[in-house]
Amino acid sequence: MANPKAKMSKSRRDKRRAQFNARTKAATTVICPNCGEPTLPHRACRHCGQYRGRAVVTKSANS
């Protein structure tokens, strides 16, 4: 059976495990209070451009 040549540090171990968790867990979404579309938490809404009641991203007229 294979044995490790050197001790793996906690940070290196956790970095490896983080990749598995990032791929298996679904992204958390919240409902935008302004337009009602699902969006990522703590980020501006992709549909209306608002974050915490303020317009932070201006939407162009043709989109």
UniProtKB/Swiss-Prot annotation:
Query: Which organism does this sequence originate in?
Result: Chlorobium luteolum (strain DSM 273 / BCRC 81028 / 2530)
The protein's GO terms of the molecular function aspect are: structural constituent of ribosome
Report what the protein is called.
Large ribosomal subunit protein bL32
Which regions form coiled coils? none
InterPro entries noted in UniProt: Ribosomal_bL32, Ribosomal_bL32_bact, Ribosomal_zn-bd
* Keyword Ribonucleoprotein attached: yes
Please note every region of biased composition (Basic residues).
7-18
Region listing for Disordered, in residue ranges: 1-22
Q: Please give the family membership noted in the entry.
A: Belongs to the bacterial ribosomal protein bL32 family.
Q: Which Pfam families match?
A: Ribosomal_L32p
What are the GO cellular component annotations? large ribosomal subunit
Q: Which UniProt keywords apply?
A: Ribonucleoprotein, Ribosomal protein
- Judging by the UniProt lineage, the source's domain of life is Bacteria
Q: Name one GO biological process term.
A: translation
